[in-house]
Amino acid sequence: TIIQFAVETGMRRSEILKLQWNDINLNTGIASLYDTKNGDDRHIPLTKKAIKLLSNFTQTTEFVFPISANCLRLAWERCKNKSNIKGLRFHDLRHEAVSRFFEMGLSVPEVALISGHKDVRQLFRYTHLKPENLIAKYSNIF
């Protein structure tokens, strides 16, 4: 679930692990992130899938994902080993999310708001668009 949530939100691992239930409003679909990597607070819209993932959780602790960074790292390594995947970092899920946001048609300012990137050049480093995913959008324009 934490992997799906990471891809749906584009949040950093540290932001996901610090996320508390009182930071989330499932009615408005907004997650509030405080003291992020760049020092700013950020309020991000959640996708329907992210809201559904969170709605299926039982709130037993103040943290949405009550695990340590080390526990997540070890679980990530186990998942990669079981799947025989080499070289994939948890942070790559953030790259995937940013690429998906652009493929959904979100603008640069919208994706920057969600991801927290202040520098557009850095944001574009996270973007790995797939031509096959843009065919339908391209067809609608011409």
Report residues per predicted region:
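P-loop NTP-binding/switch modules centered on Walker-like glycine-rich loops
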Residues: 1
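C-terminal catalytic core of tyrosine-transesterase DNA break-rejoin enzymes
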Residues: 4, 8-11, 15, 92-118, ...
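Conserved tyrosine-mediated DNA breakage-rejoining catalytic core shared by Y-recombinases
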Residues: 9-14, 18-53
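Residue-level detection of the helix-turn-helix DNA-binding "recognition helix"
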Residues: 21, 77, 81, 103, ...
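Exposed loop/turn and edge beta-strand positions of beta-sandwich/beta-sheet ligand-binding modules
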Residues: 27, 40, 59, 84, ...
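Conserved beta-strand positions that form and line the central face of beta-propeller blades
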Residues: 32, 64, 89-92, 122-125
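Catalytic-site neighborhood detector that most strongly recognizes the C-terminal catalytic loop/helix
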Residues: 35-39, 49-51, 70, 108, ...
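Active-site/catalytic core of tyrosine-dependent DNA strand-transfer enzymes
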Residues: 47-86
